[in-house]
Amino acid sequence: MINKIAVLGCGWLGLPLAKSLLAKSYFINGSTTSAEKLPTILSNGIAPFLVQLGSKLTGDDLQLFLNVDLLIINIPPGRSTNQADDYEAKISALTQEIQKSTIQKVIFISSTSVYPDNQTTVDERCNLINESDAAKRMIKAEEIIKSIPNIQSTVIRMAGLIGPNRHPGRFFAGKENIPAGLSPVNLIHLDDCIGIIEFVIENDLWNQTYNGAAPSHPLKLDFYSLASQKYNGSLAKFLSETGNYKIVDSRKIVSKGYQFKHPDLMEWLLQTPQS
């Protein structure tokens, strides 16, 4: 039975997730790499911890942070080359600490970027043949997590993230000649990121891999043109061409009974107030 949960990485997704889990009566530890964010975590009723993940895991009261039943790992690779190169070492170091702890289960937040843009629909059964260095690093991280001895782990591959303070219109507002306007989008709202994670926990869906992407895939041209207008009233002009793309299929988690809160991305966008 899961009573205590640690959220490693209380950022845009991690903090709302921790708050939602707390509201469901779980005891929550939350980590950040920034001392300035500790008061925010504490003010939400979450036990705050300053944790740095490098070639070894460091932080005050590290054993106390990991004294939980479930660890949710929400730490994507850094954007710089050096940060990304260290990602495998960071995940490996983390697994060493997991094995010393009371942790029984792990949820690893991955990305649909592990799938190649091969002009087809992709699901969890696909071979992950992707030449992108970033994808290779994430695939390797998934493998490391899945191989931790005596730990039940589930990987959730999230699509592009949208929601509060992450309005999709900000990406292309006012730009012109944007390529691949006829390619479909793969996105997921924050509410469904949290919803899928909680669904996995509540239904004991362990030793699995699930995609997290809204079941609707509007064209990039249609979605981001409307998003840009809703964001600041400016236009985004796309080229009417199909570039490299994929359509991420999330029917596996739906088949288990999950119902998306925002299945229709265009409908969500229409209902979103203008920024």
What is each model feature region?
Residues 14-15:
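N-terminal Rossmann-fold NAD(P) dinucleotide-binding loop
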Residues 47, 51-55, 234-236, 240-275:
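C-terminal amphipathic/interface module of NAD(P)-dependent oxidoreductases
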Residues 63-107, 140:
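NAD(P)-cofactor binding segment of oxidoreductase domains
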Residues 92-131:
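Conserved Rossmann-fold NAD(P)-dependent oxidoreductase catalytic core, especially the SDR/UDP-sugar
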Residues 139, 162-175, 199-210:
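Glycine/proline-rich active-site loop of Rossmann-fold NAD(P)-dependent oxidoreductases
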Residues 140-164:
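Conserved beta-loop-beta element that borders a ligand/cofactor-binding pocket
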Residues 155-158, 167-168, 178-201:
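Substrate-positioning beta->alpha
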Residues 196-250:
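Mid/C-terminal beta-alpha module of Rossmann-like enzyme folds, strongest
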